[in-house]
Curated annotation (Swiss-Prot):
The enzyme's E.C. designation: 2.3.2.29
GO biological process: ubiquitin-dependent protein catabolic process via the N-end rule pathway
Catalysis: reaction(s): N-terminal L-glutamyl-[protein] + L-leucyl-tRNA(Leu) = N-terminal L-leucyl-L-glutamyl-[protein] + tRNA(Leu) + H(+); N-terminal L-aspartyl-[protein] + L-leucyl-tRNA(Leu) = N-terminal L-leucyl-L-aspartyl-[protein] + tRNA(Leu) + H(+)
Organism: Thiobacillus denitrificans (strain ATCC 25259 / T1)
Keyword flag rRNA-binding: no
Any one cellular-component term (Gene Ontology): cytoplasm
Family: Belongs to the R-transferase family. Bpt subfamily.
Main subcellular localisation: cytoplasm
Name of the protein this chain belongs to: Aspartate/glutamate leucyltransferase
Name of encoding gene: bpt
The protein's role, per its UniProt record: Functions in the N-end rule pathway of protein degradation where it conjugates Leu from its aminoacyl-tRNA to the N-termini of proteins containing an N-terminal aspartate or glutamate.
Gene Ontology terms for molecular function: arginyl-tRNA--protein transferase activity; leucyl-tRNA--protein transferase activity
Domain of life, source organism: Bacteria
Amino acid sequence: MHPTEPPFQRIQFYLTAQYDCSYLPGRLARSQVATPTHLIDHHAYGALIRAGFRRSGQFTYRPNCEGCQACVPVRVDVSGFVPNRTQRRCLKRNRGLAARFLPLDFKDEHYALYRAYLGSRHAGGGMDRDGPEQYTQFLLSSNVDSVLVEFRDGDAVVMVAVIDQVDDGLSAVYTFFDPAREQDSLGVYGVLWQIELAKRLDLPYLYLGYWIGESRKMAYKKQYPPLQGLVDGSWQALEA
């Protein structure tokens, strides 16, 4: 879908200045941003997601980098997904976690978990210095159909996921978890749980953002076949 087609006719698009790529060292990135945010309703947002856009706070964007197409938007066809042996073990290990749907409200324990996660996984990347205001703008500001899911082990919050719902699926916005529980593979469980949620809601897809084959942080997404990628303007199967 091209940005000049419905329902994009009232939405404008601009290109950001170039900035250092977060995933591929030594490369410059640039984004195409949809604006104004108040016109991006549920219907328009779903169309943008299908066109390869993502949401960060109230900004809806997609990569538009000169000479680079490494970022491939991907989605899981949830009806065809069958967990492998390792994923089944992960599901079994974490079945005791209690999931609770919450509005996008600030909670001190969520923010503390977010800081611990970034300090362990993304130290020195800039995000690990996010204060409460940056956290709120990034994860708790939304004009679309969004929910925060809290996962508890007893009294302890061990994982938080922010999820958007669109017409044909769920979009995994961001998930963070207790870095001290690496043996529980909570990141994997978060994806598996969202696949199961999409199935329960009778939605065909879970949108996972961008797959980048050269980035170890993003290449994991091929572990959830059947995976489709938006290539040359059309969604097509990606080889596992």
